[in-house]
Design a protein with these regions (language model features):
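Structured loop/turn residues at beta-strand edges in well-structured enzyme cores
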Residues: 7, 27-30, 46, 67, ...
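Active-site HxH/HxHxD metal-binding segment of metal-dependent hydrolases
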Residues: 1-41, 51-57
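Cap/insert and terminal regions of metallo-dependent hydrolase folds
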Residues: 7, 11-23, 80, 88-177
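Core dinuclear metal-dependent hydrolase active-site scaffold
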Residues: 1, 35-101, 177-198
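Short low-complexity, flexible loop/linker segments enriched in glycine and/or proline
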Residues: 28-30, 47, 154-156, 188-190
């Protein structure tokens, strides 16, 4: 949790409005940097870019849309990385790809979806297309295999996204939950390990 990280992390980069939550949890204002979409900030050798997403915000009843939701771009001299965050599919992915792509690695939301939630969570096929839109060299599906918020099966997100990604010639990294990966390694984990789970 943030409360366990606050003594170990020197800077917190958040979308606009999220700093209030961090201050309430004891993070010093001096350590919080809130960004609007398309704003960039440097930290040592890294550049963080707050980019659009399509979701909502809120941590309790009555505060929905009180803060900005976002995706993130993390750039170094060696890597250009995209993190989709929670997002419905939309034209913002192509815009991000045009402005900041191609990306060496993209972590793309895939899971906890329903046709009724299309504005805030992508279907797996849209996840694969969004990776193409941002010009990812490799995508890693995230937001699946953990908490259950939707009615789909546990394997449905990963089976559908890998199938669509294959159709689109989009390489997919599929590390086991908790397995570390090396971003500049020529081969990413691609084993279909979930097929072994009953």
């Amino acid at each position: 949790s943030v409360q366990k990280l606050k003594g170990k992390v020197s800077k917190f980069y958040t979308p606009l409005g999220v700093g209030a939550h961090l201050r309430a949890w004891g993070v010093s204002s001096d350590n919080i940097h809130e960004l609007n979409w398309w704003e960039e900030i440097k930290h040592e050798e890294l550049t963080f870019v707050c980019a659009p997403a399509r979701h909502f915000s809120g941590r309790a009843f009555g505060d929905r849309f009180a803060t900005l939701w976002a995706s993130w771009i993390i750039q170094s001299k060696q890597q250009n990385i995209f993190f989709s965050g929670d997002s419905g599919y939309g034209p913002h992915f192509k815009t991000i790809g045009e402005k900041y792509g191609p990306f060496d690695f993209a972590m793309m939301e895939c899971g906890q979806y329903d046709a009724r939630w299309a504005n805030i969570h992508m279907m797996p096929e849209e996840t694969a297309q969004a990776a193409v839109d941002v010009k990812a060299n490799v995508m890693m599906p995230i937001h699946w295999g953990t908490f259950v918020l939707a009615l789909h099966t546990w394997k449905d997100p990963i089976e559908r996204v890998t199938r669509k990604a294959a159709e689109l010639n989009m390489p997919v990294a599929t590390p086991r939950i908790g397995e570390p990966i090396v971003l500049n390694h020529p081969e990413m984990p691609a084993k279909k390990w979930w097929e072994e789970i009953q």
